């Protein structure tokens, strides 16, 4: 079968999506005697499609190139977040019509991956210099699936914190390498009939391909954090469209923000914070960190 021939080709070190030629002779035995035929045959194996060098869990995948934020310096390449076996994702800024590539080191061998004219993810063979481009500059979420040899691009627009009570919005700036943030942020909470001391539920919103999605907590109704709460409290999970806006929300930490006196029906934090969203591989998951502004500057 073709699959059996492909397996033989792999043993012969033939690369995927190439042709390889195997030569053969017949060796005959009779007791202790043996003879090798003078005639030689050969057959060509058409190797199946695929990626030869699949990175393991401990072999990171990066995006690099003139079209990326590292300007072609592989030492500054942005690591992609491993989502699952063979699946990697990154949020990054790309330049229109400028080349980039995906790379990894697999069993000590530097490997590069690109997308062909048919949109198929492939591994570059020795001597090849294929790259990837996008037609429009912008911030993208890029997801590659090496097992299925696919790639997807999502254009990212505004990113902001959103208080459900009062509909208050705080926009974030793109900081580079998959990070968004705001400095000297003054948190606020608004009183409600069920929350006389103020409703603090909030989440983060992101425009993806023109549609606004929420990023929230993994639990539907998580309680309020304090100063000893583990940082994983603010790990970010993309929520399905149509999810109730109050569910899977975060809550502010009263001990950190130290609310002032009520002004009208709103409380304002007396401690300003620097808030950073990490949509990259820095912490092994997408997450948010809040620091008092003075501490963040130190």
Task: Annotate the PLM regions.
Residues 294-298:
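A short, hydrophobic C-terminal helix/tail in secreted or cell-surface proteins
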Residues 1-293:
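Insoluble glucan recognition modules
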């Amino acid at each position: 079968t073709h699959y059996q021939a492909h397996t033989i080709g792999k043993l012969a070190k033939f690369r995927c999506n190439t042709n390889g030629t195997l030569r053969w002779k017949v060796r005959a035995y009779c007791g202790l005697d043996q003879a090798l035929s003078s005639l030689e045959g050969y057959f060509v194996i058409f190797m199946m499609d695929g990626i030869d060098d699949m990175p393991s869990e401990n072999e990171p995948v990066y995006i690099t190139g003139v079209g990326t934020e590292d300007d072609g310096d592989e030492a500054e390449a942005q690591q992609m977040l491993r989502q699952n076996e063979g699946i990697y994702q990154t949020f990054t800024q790309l330049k229109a019509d400028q080349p980039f590539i995906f790379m990894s080191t697999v069993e000590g061998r530097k490997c590069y991956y690109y997308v062909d004219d048919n949109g198929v993810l492939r591994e570059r063979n020795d001597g090849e210099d294929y790259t990837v481009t996008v037609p429009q500059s912008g911030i993208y979420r890029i997801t590659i699936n090496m097992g299925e040899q696919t790639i997807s691009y999502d254009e990212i627009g505004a990113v902001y914190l959103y208080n459900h009570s009062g509909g208050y919005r705080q926009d974030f700036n793109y900081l580079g390498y998959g990070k968004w943030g705001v400095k000297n942020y003054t948190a606020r909470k608004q009183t409600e009939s069920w929350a006389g001391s103020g409703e603090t539920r909030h989440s983060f919103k992101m425009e993806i391909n023109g549609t606004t999605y929420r990023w929230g907590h993994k639990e539907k109704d998580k309680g309020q954090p304090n100063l000893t709460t583990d940082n994983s409290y603010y790990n970010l999970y993309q929520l399905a469209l149509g999810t109730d806006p109050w569910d899977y929300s975060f809550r502010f930490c009263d001990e950190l923000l130290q609310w002032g006196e009520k002004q009208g029906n709103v409380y304002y934090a007396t401690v300003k914070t620097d808030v950073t969203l990490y949509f990259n591989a820095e912490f092994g998951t997408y997450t948010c960190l809040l620091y008092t502004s003075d501490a963040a500057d130190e």
